[in-house]
Swiss-Prot record:
Annotated localization: Cytoplasm
Gene name of the record: nep1
Source domain of life: Eukaryota
Described purpose of this protein according to its UniProt entry: Protease that catalyzes two essential functions in the NEDD8 pathway: processing of full-length NEDD8 to its mature form and deconjugation of NEDD8 from targeted proteins such as the pcu1, pcu2 and pcu4 cullins and other proteins.
E.C. number: 3.4.22.-
Lineage of producing organism: Eukaryota, Fungi, Dikarya, Ascomycota, Taphrinomycotina
PTM sites of type Phosphoserine: S329, S340, S351
Family, similarity comment: Belongs to the peptidase C48 family.
Keywords assigned by UniProt, alphabetized: Cytoplasm, Hydrolase, Phosphoprotein, Protease, Thiol protease
Keyword flag Cell cycle: no
Protein known as: NEDD8-specific protease 1
Length: 420
């Protein structure tokens, strides 16, 4: 556990200085940063829609790790996890790739899995995706154990990050948007889970979360345990539930949706999701701030480097169509040319339903330098507080039990019908 002083105690969240700093770019979100967003959603948004809110469970990162990696039975898990778990319809699970690294060292990437319990469907959102779902499969298998049903997992197309540190910010943005939709839609359709056209401005979201933290400390103090007052300015300090989140003016790349899904069965769990199809040439305007982020990566922690290769469209007009220089004779009167409807250039408006023709670069496996990525040694997250408990063989502080056997290697966790 970090020895830095506590900046804020907000319900069950204990903010250290590094957690405060993690909200600002170019830093990775800590697990506490994600806890903070979940607490704000539960205390500022849920009271407005109590019936729908009762169906949603935002599972904290430390509990997701417990769910995925603890060598305990489903019955023991039910005791350690929130009582609401077995009655919820929609389970949000922020996934950290902690199992790739030594215990206590921290993971290097955040992604999001949401389980729709009645449908037996899991949706996976990854802002640094290659179309695979390896990081979430342990959690998926344990969810299947808990609810005694098989779940199909679908890798969803989402905005791809353009730097090495915004994965946690994207997870929070995806969570905010999906919760907002669920609260407004008591009977969600499959299209509600589609975030392919959702282009959040994660920089603006980071700034708003920092401002909200400052407002809480300045107006309520450094210890907040009771509910927020009804006059708390949620819409201006946090995010207005009735409005959209901050969005980008210029669209960033979206990973194409995988054409097949994987069930928690032997056949499907041993096969990767289909690789995303490669897109054609691209012609889009890059966000200036995103370009600066790419140059910052050499000076900060990051998990992967992506080099986006952008090609420019060729001139659409053929040589025969190009306008020739014309020098009129003295007797020739120059007429202004008004193009006919057939000559008018049609504006190209990207359509969410016509992704193949959009001028958006689509990230595919062939555009990634896999050998270079494999050689990169991920730098641990600045603070993943659950790791200190793990190193000591203790459960996270959120649990009452301290007697449960805790960790085994991930490959030994899954048995029976769910080999991964």
């Amino acid at each position: 556990m970090s020895s830095s002083p506590t900046v804020l105690e907000l319900f069950d969240v204990c903010f250290k200085q590094e957690d405060v700093d993690s909200l600002k770019k170019p830093n990775w979100f800590t697990d506490v940063s994600i806890d903070y967003v979940d607490e704000l959603i539960e205390h500022l948004w849920f009271p407005s829609y109590p019936n729908q809110a009762n169906e949603i469970l935002l599972l904290r990162p430390s509990l997701v790790f417990l769910l995925a990696e603890a060598a305990i039975s489903p019955e023991e898990l039910k005791v350690a996890l929130p009582k609401k778990l077995m009655n919820c319809k929609y389970l949000f699970m922020p996934i950290n790739d902690l199992d790739k690294h030594a215990a206590g060292s921290g993971g290097s990437h955040w992604s999001l899995m949401v389980a729709s319990i009645p449908d037996g469907q899991c949706y996976y959102y990854d802002s640094l995706s290659n179309g695979k779902t390896k990081d979430c499969r342990s959690a998926l298998a344990r969810v299947s154990d808990l609810f005694k049903k098989k779940f199909t997992i679908e890798c969803m197309p989402v905005q791809q990050q353009r730097n090495g540190y915004d994965c946690g910010a994207h997870v929070c943005a995806f969570t905010l948007e999906l919760v907002r939709r669920l609260l407004h839609s008591p009977m969600p359709t499959s299209s509600m889970w589609n975030l392919s056209t959702f282009q959040p401005d994660v920089t603006a979201i980071r700034e708003q979360l920092s401002r909200c933290l400052d407002h809480i400390i300045n107006s309520l103090g450094t210890r907040v345990s009771g509910d927020f007052d009804e006059d708390f300015p949620t819409g201006t300090v946090f995010f207005d539930l009735e409005s959209h989140l901050p969005l980008l003016d210029v669209a960033l790349p979206v990973l194409p949706k995988s054409s097949d899904s994987s069930e928690t069965s032997h056949e499907s769990s041993n096969s990767n999701l289909k690789k995303s199809s490669e897109s054609g040439s691209t012609n889009h305007h890059n966000n200036h701030e995103s370009d600066k982020d790419l140059h910052h990566e050499g000076h900060h922690h990051h998990h992967h480097h992506h080099h986006h290769h952008h090609s420019h469209d060729d001139d659409p007009s053929s040589p025969a169509e190009k306008k020739q220089n014309h020098v009129p004779s003295p007797s020739e009167k120059i007429q202004d040319h008004v193009p006919s409807p057939s000559e008018k250039k049609q504006d190209r408006v990207p359509s969410p339903s016509n992704n193949k023709e959009d001028h958006l670069p689509l990230l595919s496996d062939e555009k990634l330098d896999k050998s270079a990525i494999d050689k990169i040694e991920p730098t641990p997250l600045p603070s993943v507080h659950m790791n200190s408990h793990i190193a000591k063989g203790e459960l996270p502080k959120f649990h009452n039990s301290t007697d449960n056997p805790f960790l085994t290697p991930p490959e030994e966790l899954v048995s029976g019908d769910f080999p991964f």
